[in-house]
């Protein structure tokens, strides 16, 4: 078994449908064809939940390299929360247990506040509905929902329908709509404290237009020409849903940028000049970490701890490694590959080759691939690295231009560079794994023949360049790449890596 491994990431080099849109298939790639005929290969899934994104969402380079280096699926916040609601593990979330137990034992009110829409950018109605269900399970009488209306990520008059949906859910679950206000006020992010004050006064002091029918109140606002984003404060006259000392507040937005300012005035900082004071004893829960500087707030879904990435694990075991790419993908083979860490590990060398200074890469489709290849071959021939990762950027960066002839030239350049790199690696006793992080050049045309500049949902290749004639490679996903590299290096996979070795 070889003890040296080369991981080659061909950015944007997916496995297409072999139609006209599949530039890789339709371009002469003699060396790639040789690899596919000679060595064991398989397919990796590189999009959707296989890389921790919402189902059906295209993969991207950041997420791809994060999963490749982590050796596990790294879930995005939204997906993590969705899964937790779906499999009911949210009920065992220690912060959820603490919030609702505290309210139950101390007879406190529970408040849910956040963007009440299906826009999917800042929040999810499903998460809100689940919170209402949990309140019902804990039998909490006073559960109040404070609705921030959208109209930016949704139709400007869709909010009335969302309030109807919420009220219908609350009727069979728990909770009452206590207040409504536009996101323009409640979710400012530009330090316009006079706007935030409108939301603060509504939530804390119950200042707003009194209404007995919240859906009707929304319609009246529309009739006056005021749509969702700008809805003025509305108070449910039938309940006292103001936030009081020692209450439980759950801010259910999972995106942080527009949740910070309201959190600041409720929990972090008195602003007497603006008439806003933090509320004593508030049990305040954020869906995700809103700001590392916030004190005394709870976090329902904390950031993933990506410990023991491939880079970290190799360094801890005294291995020498090289990470190399041109500028466009340098952050991907360093920062993202190492789980979001800027600083190199011990014995980790990095080579950055400048990308060409052109307006768009169709003007130079080979980019800096040949320069990367030359530096890489020289490094391979030094024979001092146990592990090397390289990214060839062309398939993705030229793929994004949508210019077919340029993508063809990019594919030709990559094929030539793969040849020189792999032949050098074989001569020095390296085994290689060749993959992509996601597709792009494999799907360059839409069905109507217009250029497609986006990534594709296609699987990506996994080629195992080895002397072992018996070897086979199983299908998998990007999270399986790091365990496979460790297998080549004859190293035991750390517990944190939940991916699988694909070499059989």
Curated annotation (Swiss-Prot):
GO biological process, one term: glycolytic process
Catalytic activity: (2R)-2-phosphoglycerate = (2R)-3-phosphoglycerate
Entry's Gene Ontology molecular function annotations: manganese ion binding; phosphoglycerate mutase activity
GO cellular component: cytosol
EC number from the UniProt entry: 5.4.2.12
CDD domains: iPGM
This protein's record includes keyword Manganese: yes
Keywords: Glycolysis, Isomerase, Manganese, Metal-binding
Superkingdom of origin: Bacteria
Enzyme class: isomerase
Pathway(s) of this molecule: Carbohydrate degradation; glycolysis; pyruvate from D-glyceraldehyde 3-phosphate: step 3/5
Binding sites annotated in the UniProt record for substrate: 122, 152-153, 183, 189, 255-258, 329
Residues annotated as the enzyme's active site: 61
Alphabetical list of InterPro entries matching this protein: Alkaline_phosphatase_core_sf, BPG-indep_PGM_N, Metalloenzyme, PGAM_B_sf, Pgm_bpd_ind
Cofactor note: Binds 2 manganese ions per subunit.
Cofactor: Mn(2+)
Binding site for Mn(2+) 2: 11, 61, 437-438
Binding site for Mn(2+) 1: 396, 400, 455
Family: Belongs to the BPG-independent phosphoglycerate mutase family.
Quaternary context: Monomer.
Xref: NCBIfam families: pgm_bpd_ind
Main function: Catalyzes the interconversion of 2-phosphoglycerate and 3-phosphoglycerate.
Record-given protein name: 2,3-bisphosphoglycerate-independent phosphoglycerate mutase
Organism: Bacteroides fragilis (strain YCH46)
Lineage: Bacteria, Pseudomonadati, Bacteroidota, Bacteroidia, Bacteroidales
Gene name as annotated: gpmI
């Amino acid at each position: 078994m070889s003890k040296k491994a080369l991981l080659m990431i061909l950015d944007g080099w997916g496995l297409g449908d072999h139609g006209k849109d599949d530039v890789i298939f339709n371009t002469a790639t003699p060396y790639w064809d040789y690899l596919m005929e000679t060595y064991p290969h398989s397919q990796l899934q590189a999009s959707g939940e296989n890389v921790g994104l919402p189902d059906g969402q295209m993969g991207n380079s950041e997420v791809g390299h994060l999963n490749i280096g982590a050796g596990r699926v790294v879930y995005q916040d939204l997906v993590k929360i969705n899964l937790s609601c779906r499999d009911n593990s949210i009920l065992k979330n220690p912060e959820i247990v603490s919030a609702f137990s505290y309210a139950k034992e101390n007879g406190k009110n529970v408040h849910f506040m956040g963007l009440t829409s299906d826009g999917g950018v800042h929040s999810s109605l499903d998460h809100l509905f689940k919170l209402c269900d949990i309140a019902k399970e804990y039998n909490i009488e006073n559960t109040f929902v404070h609705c921030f209306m959208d109209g930016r990520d949704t139709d400007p008059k869709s909010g009335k329908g969302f309030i109807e949906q919420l009220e219908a859910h609350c009727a069979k679950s728990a909770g009452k709509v206590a207040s409504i206000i536009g996101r323009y006020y409640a979710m400012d992010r530009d330090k316009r404290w006079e706007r935030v004050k409108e939301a603060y006064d509504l939530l804390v002091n119950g200042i707003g237009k009194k209404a007995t029918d919240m859906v009707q109140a929304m319609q009246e606002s529309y009739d006056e020409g005021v749509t969702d984003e700008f809805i003025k404060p509305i108070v449910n006259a039938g309940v006292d849903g103001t936030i009081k000392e020692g209450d439980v507040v759950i801010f259910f937005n999972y995106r942080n940028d527009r949740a910070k300012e309201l959190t600041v005035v409720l929990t972090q900082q008195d602003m007497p000049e603006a008439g806003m004071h933090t509320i004593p004893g508030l049990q305040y829960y954020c869906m995700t970490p809103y700001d590392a500087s916030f004190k005394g707030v709870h976090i329902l879904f904390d950031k993933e701890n990506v410990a023991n990435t491939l880079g970290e694990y190799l360094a801890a075991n005294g291995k020498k490694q090289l990470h190399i790419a041109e500028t466009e993908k340098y952050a991907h083979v360093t920062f993202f590959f190492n789980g979001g860490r800027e600083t190199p590990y011990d014995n980790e060398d990095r080579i950055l080759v400048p990308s060409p200074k052109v307006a768009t890469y169709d003007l130079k489709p080979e980019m800096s691939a040949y320069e990367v290849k030359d530096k890489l071959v020289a490094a391979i021939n030094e024979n001092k690295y146990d592990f090397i990762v390289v990214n060839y950027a062309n398939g993705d960066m030229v793929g994004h231009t949508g210019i077919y002839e340029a993508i063809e030239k990019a594919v030709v350049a990559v094929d030539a560079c793969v040849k020189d790199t792999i032949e050098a690696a074989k001569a020095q006793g390296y085994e290689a794994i060749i993959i992509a992080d996601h597709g792009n050049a494999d799907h360059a045309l839409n069905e109507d023949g217009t250029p497609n500049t986006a990534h594709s949902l296609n699987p990506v290749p996994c080629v195992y360049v080895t002397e072992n004639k018996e070897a086979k490679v199983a299908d998998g996903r990007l999270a399986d790449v790091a365990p496979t590299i460790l297998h080549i290096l004859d190293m035991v996979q750390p517990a944190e890596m939940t991916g699988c070795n694909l070499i059989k």
